[in-house]
Amino acid sequence: MAVSEDRKFTKEQVYTLLEGAKGKTLGEVDKSHQFARTLESKKITGIAGDVIEQSVFGYKKDSKQECDIEIDGVLTEVKTTGVRVPKRDLKNVSGKKGEAYNIYLGAKEGISITHVTFEPPIQTDFDTSHFWEKTERLLIIFYEYKSYEVVPASGYAKFPIVDYCYNSFSQEEKDKLQNDWEIVSSHLQQVYHDYQDAEKRNEQLVGFTHLLRPNLLLIELVPGFKRTATGSYQKPRYRLKQTFVDYIVRGHFDKSRAKNEIVLKESFSSFAQLDARCHALTLKYKGKTLPELREMLGIDAKVKDISAKCVIRMFGTDCNRLNQISDFNKAGIIAKTITITPQGGRTEDMKLKHIDFEEWADRDADFEDSDVYDYFCEHSFLCPIFCEHDSKDPSKTVFEGFKRFAFDEEFIENEVRRTWEDSRNLIHRNELEWEYVYDKKGNKRMNNSGSYMGAPNFPKSSEYKVFFRGGADVSTEKTRTESVNGIRMLPQFFWLKGSYIAKKLQEIPYI
């Protein structure tokens, strides 16, 4: 595969071009007048990438499944992606600049790589696949999405180019990417073998992205394969998960991470390998009480969350929380210890994701394109299960094993979409209200901090499986830092209803 002469560069030329662009806004480097298109269209997907490719590098855009450029004879894919300081870290970056500021930057979204190949012959060799050819060597340019609201395409002109990096994957990461790709390839091969007729084959492929999703570690398939109103079929692209891109971004800006990173001594290249590891741990530790586990794993008796610490030690590592393990973070695996009764009940509500209200302000946003949709698609849960036989005697609590689940299409389309749409309607119709809590006499109740108790009328756990709840140690006027429709409130989070989790876990066998 060769590129045209206008796409051939030396590393020195690339350095000169990108160093000259760093610190400038996308609008300032737009020599090819990409932003002129925004006069006619408010939404232009990929306009930041168009500016980098056509203005900074100076080559024309194409849609070929080939690498963008050649650097000193080495084929390289150019990717432009947005980074941003999460709202939770805004207090930490106040007054900071340069490297001290940049270490707080995280990925705004995943990185789209290339179209999934559907036309036969289906590619079967990973090393020569379009996906790996475009992923093996990446030149990633970072711009800062300096907004917490959705901006029109023209607004990107104000976003600064922060930095860039050359990215190649470790052997461990390549193994994970290869396993993900082979899962997709094998599925397509089987469908093409079983269904020779194109229409029947397409009907069989509808929804296959959701079917494969629980088994993919680092890759996401978006959008879903489905029939459109015109009768054609919407086909997906390979995309690196936002969780994985976030790992890349933070590793680039925080050079000290490698020293402090918490990794498993024995990682896994597939969910099948992780499941096998969990099964082996279950065989070894199932039925052991917390005191027995503490002694077997060498854990100090003063440790507070003993069950979580036991699981951390089972995996051969040592940290404060399971979700500090980078192997889990890359793949969007949320590790959460669950304590049940012998009947399987009493599971607490689970706190999930902080809500950025930028998408709620965009009336034209589609659910399938939303950050909320991506979150529920990309994340799965690994649940170490403990059974509490006596609520008054923790020493009788025993380890039962592991269960793992992802959100299926039905749950996302029904429960998550319902919460997303209903909360957006409250905002767009100006129906969002503050609801005070009253005592039996009809007086407003006050909390221990002296503030009146209450919350906005967002979806509640009484009626929704996915609901809103504020997050702060105390609720005061000072901690109500979020403002929606002029109503001040605590930062809002998505929560998952405990009864749903309990029912889901009862339906799933132990690994």
Language-model region placement:
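Nucleic-acid endonuclease domains
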Residues: 1-74, 80-511
